[in-house]
Amino acid sequence: MDILRVLSRGIKPNPKSKAQAGGATTQLPSAGALPRPQLFHDPVGSRGKKRKRRRGAQDDEPEGDDQELSDVDYFAPKKAAPEAAPTDVEESPKKRKIKLLDEDECRQILRSHRLKLTILSDQPQAEAKTEAEEPASKKKSSKKKKKETEGKDKKDKKDEHKKQIFPQPLTSFGELRHTYDVSPQLAANIAAQGFRVPTEVQMASLPLLLQPTTALKKSEGADIPNIDNGADFLAVAPTGSGKTITFLIPAIDGVLRRRAEEGRDTDQHVLEAVVVAPTRELATQIVNEGRKLAIGTGVRVVLMKRALKLDVEEVADEKSKDLEEGSGSEQGSGDEESEGEEESEGEEGKTSKEAKPLARVDILVTTPKILLNFLSGKAGARRLLPSVRSLILDEADVLLDPLFRKQTMAICRACTHPNVALTCWSATMASNVEALVTKHLLQARQEDRQPTPALHDELKYDIPLEAGGSARVAVLHSSMADSARSKIMARFRAGEVWVLVTTDVLARGVDFAGVNGVVNYDVPTSAAAYVHRAGRTGRAGREGGVAVTFYTKDDIPFVKSVANVIAASEKQAGVQADGGGGGTVQKWLLDALPKVAKEDKRKLKVRGVESRRTGGKATITTKSSWERRREHNRAQAVEASKRRKRQRREEGPAAGEAEGEWGGLED
């Protein structure tokens, strides 16, 4: 017997509410695949083109339209004209390679999709040098004139420093085979995965990463550095825009090209690309996507494990302490494993610790710490990766954060090939992008991992047994074993787990296409953290997801960054809050929220909210609200009893003295 049906027997269903509920469910992110992978396609007018029509052209256009309309004849047997076009394309594929767009056409396409590509150079050092060599007579000028000249010079230098380029855009994945000479098997795998129209990041990145000389062939007037051996690349794109596929396709294509140039067989594997991800879940996802693209190519995409042995070059180095600082507490275990392997080589009886053969790897996907433990080697020595030609940092802003920065820099130093190319990918980047890439400096963001299991214990009893009970709630944190984390990820993707409690770092980049809602139990420490959290519901431009943020009185000063991000995204989507278009952030709310200084924002990133860091009332408890209320009432009753006893002790002697002074009734 269904108790809900019995209780609602006398209630008549409302057909309007059913229709609204049905319409709402179809708009959820889990409703299906997005038919439109591109987020932007703004109309951009042609540059330098006359808008006034000529007399001859004005008369010619209708004739062309009439000719196009006259071709639609259902009784005409002639079909030679439409059949001639595909035959010409098939007979002369070389013409499609040479056919490139002009710089003006590239500019229009890139701007219509809101794409901007710039060259990052060493201009700041030149600026410092010129400022130091200024003559003393120039510094004695008036303050007003000095400010004007300095502002103009800085603006000119800034424009020269941020030189914008317009490479060839990728309009369809079919161009990879003909224009950029991608392997036929790789092109077939891309088509088998259903990729037809590229997203914005794929449109701008793939031509530069596959063949930069071809992509920049039509660029004029740009001081382009030497890119014959590849180029370092930094990409900032929204979550769910296909960044994983964008850096995997050039990595696999580069392995195939170098294998063909060197004449190696498919059985000969050389480690040529390393993909670094901050979490194991994201690394596992990258491996799965890479193996789909590498079917039939002979390229092996492998996930780094502790027992994996790579072909490295071991050199003596007295400065191996840099590796020890980045490896952390688990470095000792890696050293013990390496020492155990060396001892096992001399012992014939112990078969479990025998030296393992070299792993056959072309593309290695890893997290920073496990690779660094392998590279640490013995004391006084370090291991290098001289064959690596491509180093890829996924979620680069986290890997260059002080939380992972030492480990990431140590891995970069281990890749000693002179032509190694570094590519960084993320959905958010700091404002000082150049300093982030060159010096690997970013403010630390340390997080408390204790609230994650505590919140899981708090929520696991809220789902009734009829719906699955505590099995519908799962927790994911770095203290768990790798096998347990993989099982939870598989259960969540299969729909067995409804609520997943996790942290910022573990949720970054992992593709959860069917997530309909995100609950921020704690206010994000920055706008970038909110973008990554809310991006779970908007993968590849899906609409209908809900992101709910809880905040307390202590969080009010830091809510404005989140509100600004929401307001900017709604403005970009054409949603107006005051006009009744469904906006969630009102103007009065933005004006009422206090402004936060940069120093306070820095402290928030480094130390978090002060009230939660100190503990006490802000900590998450596993007790129910009824138990907390009962304990609170009991504590208040005990406090009231103690207060009454103190009052009696204070009032007792005074009352006795007053009674002793009374002399009775007078006669």
From Swiss-Prot:
Transmembrane segments: none annotated. It comes from the Eukaryota. InterPro entries: DDX52/Rok1_DEADc, DEAD/DEAH_box_helicase_dom, Helicase_ATP-bd, Helicase_C-like, P-loop_NTPase. Residues 1-99, 121-170, 318-355, 608-667 are annotated as: Disordered. It is found in: Nucleus, Nucleolus. Coiled coil: none annotated. Residues 59-71, 333-346, 658-667 have a biased composition (Acidic residues). Residues 224-447 form the Helicase ATP-binding domain. Residues 77-86 have a biased composition (Low complexity). One of its GO terms (biological process) is maturation of SSU-rRNA. One of its GO terms (molecular function) is ATP binding. GO terms for cellular component: nucleolus. Gene3D superfamilies: P-loop containing nucleotide triphosphate hydrolases (3.40.50.300). It is an enzyme of class 3 (hydrolase). Residues 432-581 form the Helicase C-terminal domain. Keywords: ATP-binding, Helicase, Hydrolase, Nucleotide-binding, Nucleus, Ribosome biogenesis, RNA-binding, rRNA processing. Belongs to the DEAD box helicase family. DDX52/ROK1 subfamily. The Q motif is unique to and characteristic of the DEAD box family of RNA helicases and controls ATP binding and hydrolysis. This is ATP-dependent RNA helicase ROK1. It comes from Chaetomium globosum (strain ATCC 6205 / CBS 148.51 / DSM 1962 / NBRC 6347 / NRRL 1970).
